[in-house]
Amino acid sequence: MTSSVAFAPIFHLRKQAEAFAGTRIEDVVMGRPVHFVDDDAEVDARAEAKLGETAREAGFTNVKFQFEPIAAALSFEHTLDRDELVFIADIGGGTADFSVVEVGPKRRLMADRTGDILANDGIRVGGTNLDMRLSMAAVMPHLGSKSKTKTNRDLPRWPFVDLATWHRIHTLATSRNMTTFKQILADCADPVPFERYVEVIRRQGGHAIAGRIEQAKIDLSSTDTIIVDLTEAVPGFRVRATKRLFERAIAVELERLSGAIAATLQASGRKASDITTLFLTGGTSAVPAVKQVLSTLLPNARATEGDLFNSVGFGLALEAKRRFAPTKAVRRAT
């Protein structure tokens, strides 16, 4: 049995799909980011191979992959009555993927769409990166990240980065770390903020903070100032966050997104003025600062949002239909 964390959800989805269809399902088209890992083709290939192996262990025998932004393009194409040159921006929780694709009602009938895909690119920037930056800017100073030692040195940075990074939170509450935290606390010129940090760890409140920060990021899309209630992590703990603070905090990520967008456009061989539509999908594409980066680089494109969380899935279903339906006789559930 595989040790991959992806096995259980893939197996569950296959069983659910078979129950719905009333037949065994052996074929699958799985979405993948353009790059699992930035700038490392070998590791990227291993990641896809591992995911394919896990899918086969979960019961699929014929496993194919499609880039997630291409799946989003297929979803958008399904709604069109004319040809368009589309820039697809699929920015989710962990990755930002971009494609330039020619789409249209006649093109969707073609068996081979390779020539319609003018460029693909992607980077590992997504919602979790923005969450981490917001947490570091709005929450961690209240837990000691800006505090000094009795000799006026900065506190170590890693405890705060790990607490702000959702997949690192569970690593903090070890006896070794708690000993280290006590030593840091004893050396603090003002111990109060770091005492609060230690309390968060003792109460296992890190994931509560992460959840509240994710919601704060969403709320700051529609309001300028919010109070983030962190009392689930520490009683009475609340912090103020502003849109301006958030946008300053994510400046590095915005710059990386800008570079990847420009690189994708350059690779396509087309000018920004040639793009007729900017199609947005993935929850992070709804962040106003992210939208602003896209609209600045593609000023003439008509921006349209798909289903932010389901466009890729629908496009993968269309791709599976194109690849498998002509050769498979599917028995409908009764």
Please tell me what each predicted stretch does.
Residues T23-R24, L80, I91-T95, H207, ...:
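Short flexible coil/turn linkers enriched for glycine and charged/polar residues
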Residues E102-E232:
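Phosphate-binding glycine-rich/basic clefts of nucleotide- and phosphate-handling proteins
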Residues M30, A96, A173-Q183, T281-A286:
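Core structural elements
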Residues M136-M140, G144, T296, N300, ...:
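Short, well-ordered loop/turn and helix-capping segments at boundaries between secondary-structure elements
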Residues A19-T23, G144-K148, Q215-I226, A263, ...:
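Intrinsically disordered or highly flexible coil/loop and linker segments, enriched in small
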Residues R82-I91, S145, K321-T334:
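A polyampholytic, Gly/Pro-enriched intrinsically disordered region
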Residues M1-F87, G104-I123, R238-S268, T277-F279, ...:
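N-terminal phosphate-binding loop and flanking beta/alpha elements of the actin-like ATPase fold
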Residues I88-D97, G126-T128, I213, G282-T284:
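A short acidic Gly-Thr/Ser loop motif
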